[in-house]
Amino acid sequence: MKKEDYLPNLVDIESPLSDEELYVLSQQYNNEGDFVSVQTRFNYAWGLIKSRKVEDQQLGVQILAQVYKDTPSRRRECLYYLAIGSYKLGEYTDARKYCDLLLQIEPDDPQSAKLRQIIEDKLAKEGMIGIAIVGGVIAVGAAVLGAVLSQKKR
């Protein structure tokens, strides 16, 4: 298997599982009870992260974080999906942190580099929106202050 085939395309992440598919993963997870296998936990977390529901995505990130801690052999995959899950939740700083850890493991991985760029682009966009909002608030405040001061002069 080539390195670039190891992780899915980023476009695939945006296509959620059907309710039926997620239900199958959920049932497998619940049926294993107290002894849920690493693969089942990973699969369920993966399905949850692909969900459109924020609660599902949050649970997916929590499960993956535990798999990451418990199973060193799955860390690379976990980091990738932790980055994606955090990105989808709007937690861009965490997403970048996970992606950076992944790139430390495999600095030449094109999918991880692409994911890192997507995260950086989103952070830059969010930063520009924040600057625009602050600028707008300052402009409105200055206009109000100017109006108040001009009223006092009359």
Curated annotation (Swiss-Prot):
Name the record gives this protein: Mitochondrial fission 1 protein
Gene name in the database record: FIS1
Signal peptide: none
A GO BP annotation: mitochondrial fission
SUPFAM superfamilies: TPR-like
Keywords from the named record: Membrane, Mitochondrion, Mitochondrion outer membrane, Repeat, TPR repeat, Transmembrane, Transmembrane helix
Compartments it resides in: Mitochondrion outer membrane
Pfam families, per database record: Fis1_TPR_C (PF14853), Fis1_TPR_N (PF14852)
TPR repeats: 76-109
Transmembrane segments: 129-149
